[in-house]
Design a protein with these regions (language model features):
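Extended alpha-helical targeting/anchoring segments
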Residues: 45-570
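Short linear motifs in low-complexity or flexible loops
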Residues: 6-8
């Protein structure tokens, strides 16, 4: 491990990520915030060597003394306190950081980022990899595995079971840190709704064999700050293990281990020589024929005519054989379809790769937020055409009616767990533009009741009306009756739930499962009384187009790299 620089407390020594040619000594100041507002902090840019990591703990914040002080004051339910080291990141990207932590995409891990959006959405990326404990829920059994072994227990409600795990790591929110510093990262599959709503059945088939839910329990991770061009390596000090100093040092050791990985070059990862001769579109293996999907649309319209529902969202899945590495597919997808919610989840036996435009539910600072999205147009070729398309979209009565229906669903979902009179719609039917399309977007907010948690908010809002229909329960019953296979991760929730109780989840749209060399894509269409069966089928294919393009691009990238190198690495 060579010389480098890090952001450290004045007088401290620390290991960093810049090459020796850029390292040196010096001091710079910046205005403090949060608990440091009463003073100006000084940070040392320090030349370091591979000397003992215990000496480097001086650049860890809070210090052991501060942790002792905080531990004496916290509520008895608090089990952990986050500590961190801050590093410069002007020569890094979230992709390079992930490759370093995962040793070339060989270890399970996660990358959550926002490639497109405002500062609130896009400032931070969250990256982790290593020997995390894993949480898998399948057939009513929760399995928690770590380096010491596995434990199992029976559950009735997956979110209640998840809450019990999180309670053992409970932390207080720290205003000086980003909103996510550790917790569970993963997905809650669509069929989990059967645990909350017993009336909802499930489709007969199970083509993917995924668990009901899967999460990494991430107590150490990297928070990448795009605005400050810095990284925080965060871990958690356990307060319930007797020896506080030993617990603090264990957290420092985890930070040191992660920092050490950040010092090196991003490793290459294994690529497979192409064996697929056919174009991607000629490798489609749908689980539903076009004729069958049109029949599903007509069946839904009969239910609408009978007064059972107003709208329903049947879907189809397409499987595609591919030699492309899942991480190359993710790298391609983030360029093909930049979105507010970009995610790569590696669970070893399967990967979840997605670029979702739509928030499911967020809980932050006591506020629940839901973002209904309905109504879509492509971006214009010119600024004038773009404006015209937006005006045409917002004036479309059918699109407006569907959107208002979803806003009402969102108000009902949030209202079930919000304080009386607190539900509001701060944004109603605004055009929001993305890289390739524009949508009608609204926001629904409410103050979470004091006796409830973020998991209660997720339960109330899950799944989104965007992927089910209205009324939601009856629409889901019809989906279970009509669709060929269970949905699995598709239409579920992807994101994180923080040890401090915060949460940010998106709907698993524009998402694929990659397992055993097969990429599985899924999309649905919102069927109403006057929908065209042909049009709805075409819409499902259109929604998968960015995913197909990502696979095509990933295969081309890998084959080009292999041709140039004559080897098997990127």
């Amino acid at each position: 491990m060579g010389d480098g620089i890090a952001i450290a407390n004045e007088g401290g020594t620390a290991e960093g990520i810049l090459p020796p040619s850029l390292s040196g000594t010096g001091v710079f100041c910046r205005p403090a915030s949060g608990r440091h507002r009463q003073k100006v902090e000084h940070f040392m840019v320090a030349r370091t060597t591979s000397a003992g990591s215990r000496q480097a703990a001086i650049d860890i914040r809070p210090s052991l003394v501060e942790i002792r002080h905080a531990a004496a004051k916290v509520h008895s339910e608090i089990r952990t306190i986050p500590i961190y080291r801050e590093l410069l990141a002007d020569l890094e990207t979230p992709v390079s950081v992930y490759l370093k932590l995962s040793e070339g995409a060989r270890l399970p891990g996660f990358l959550l980022e926002s490639v497109e959006g405002g500062i609130r959405i896009a400032r931070y990326s969250f990256i982790g990899s290593g020997d995390y404990a894993s949480i898998e829920m399948r057939d009513g059994v929760l399995t928690e595995g770590n380096v010491e072994g596995t434990t199992t227990k029976i559950y009735q409600d997956p979110l209640t079971a998840l809450g019990e795990v999180l309670a053992t790591y409970k932390a207080e929110s720290d205003p000086d840190l980003p909103r996510f510093t550790g917790g569970v990262v993963g997905y809650l599959g669509y069929e989990s709704v059967r645990r909350f709503e017993p009336r909802v059945g499930r489709a007969a088939g199970d083509g993917l064999g995924l668990p009901e839910a899967r999460y990494h329990l991430a107590d150490t991770l990297v928070v990448f700050d795009h605005l400050q061009r810095s990284m925080k390596v965060v871990s958690h000090v356990r307060l319930d293990q007797g020896d506080l100093e030993a617990s603090y040092q264990a957290a420092v050791d985890r930070i040191d281990a992660m920092t050490s990985k950040l010092h090196g070059a991003a490793p290459s990862y294994d690529l497979n020589p192409a064996t697929q001769c056919l174009p991607v579109v000629d490798r489609f293996r749908p689980n539903t024929s076009s004729e069958r999907y049109r029949e599903m649309v007509q069946r839904v319209q009969k239910y609408i005519g009978a007064g059972d529902i107003i709208q329903c969202v049947p879907s189809q899945r397409i499987d595609i054989d591919t030699d492309a590495h899942p991480f190359t597919i993710y790298r391609a997808l983030r360029t093909v379809n930049p979105s507010p919610y970009m995610f790569f989840l590696d669970f070893g036996d399967h990967h979840i790769v997605g670029a979702s435009p739509e928030l499911l539910v967020r809980y932050e600072d006591g506020i629940i937020t839901n973002h209904p999205i309905a109504g879509t147009r492509p971006r214009g070729e010119t600024p004038a055409e773009d404006v015209a398309l937006g005006e045409e979209l917002i004036a479309d009565e059918k699109e407006r009616a569907e959107h208002i229906m979803l806003v009402d669903l969102g108000r009902n979902d949030v209202g079930r767990v919000a304080k009386s009179g607190s539900v509001r719609v701060p944004r109603l039917m605004e055009i929001e533009r993305f890289s390739h399309v524009m949508h009608i977007v609204s926001s629904v907010e409410g103050e979470l009741r004091d006796d409830l948690t973020a998991l209660d908010a997720l339960r109330s809002c899950f799944p989104a009306g965007t992927v089910s229909g209205a009324p939601k329960i009856r629409a889901m019953e019809i989906i279970a009756e009509l669709e060929t296979d269970i949905r699995g991760a598709y239409a579920g929730a992807v994101g994180y739930i923080d040890f401090a109780g915060g949460m940010d989840t998106c709907i698993a749209l524009r998402t694929m499962v990659v397992k055993n060399g097969v990429a599985s894509l899924q999309a649905g269409g919102g069927v109403v009384a006057d929908s065209s069966p042909e049009g709805e089928y075409a819409e499902t294919l259109h929604k998968m187009r960015a995913l197909v393009r990502a696979i095509e691009k990933a295969e081309l990238i890998e084959q080009t790299q292999l041709d140039r190198s004559g080897g098997t690495h990127s």
